Amino acid sequence: MNSPVTDVNALGADEVIVATGATANKIPVKGAETAIQAVDFLLGKQSVGEKVVIIGGGLTGCEIAYELYLQGKKPMIVEMMDDLIVTPGVCLANTSFLRDFFEANKVPVYLETGVTEIGEGTVTIKDKDGNLTTLEADNVILSVGYKPAPVAQKDKHIHVIGDANKVGNLRSVIWGAWDTCMKL
């Protein structure tokens, strides 16, 4: 144990459950390597300054913006879609609250907008009409989703579950694990 698994069949187990999670998506934008990954911020590995641009208006990005606002900071959300938190299955009360909160507290939300460059203290964004805007930012947080990171593929006795199989939320991964375990 405490070593990378390179061949799950070599473990000699009757059944193997792979629950290795997911890795953060990256964006092909100049300067993106200087941004903080959402998970690193959430785990307290990196702190942020006053003005923070959050790239990604999904549930995680919106919750980060909400928390930053409560800390007295100035979050700004940049989202490529035409609305925040478009993932199906997210609690409507939560999504409605966050949208209303951002509107009531004048948190800048840029919808249908992409990032063209992350610079020193700035983020350049481009809206659907091609207009460029430069935002001042002490920090940038990337919250652009995750992709499965399995160490093995499904097989008769290999069960890939949770985010290693399909990125979801806490409910979906727990229910999926329960379903798999009940079949063993």
What residues fall within each predicted segment?
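Glycine-rich nucleotide phosphate-binding loop and flanking beta-alpha elements
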Residues: 23-25, 61, 84, 131, ...
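A conserved short coil-to-beta-strand element within the FAD-binding core of flavoproteins
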Residues: 1-11, 22-25, 111-122
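Glycine-/small-residue-rich beta->alpha transition segments that form the dinucleotide
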Residues: 13-15, 19-25, 39-41, 137-150
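A conserved FAD-binding loop/helix module that cradles the flavin
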Residues: 62-64, 86-95, 159-184
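Catalytic cores of nucleotide-enabled group-transfer and carboxylate-activating enzymes in metabolic
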Residues: 9-11, 15-16, 51-54, 65, ...
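Glycine-rich dinucleotide-binding loop and its adjacent helix/turn
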Residues: 1, 6, 20-71, 156-169
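Rossmann-like dinucleotide-binding cores of NAD(P)H-dependent redox enzymes
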Residues: 67-113
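Hydrophobic/aromatic beta-strand patches that form the interior of the parallel beta-sheet core
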Residues: 15-17, 36, 53, 76-78, ...
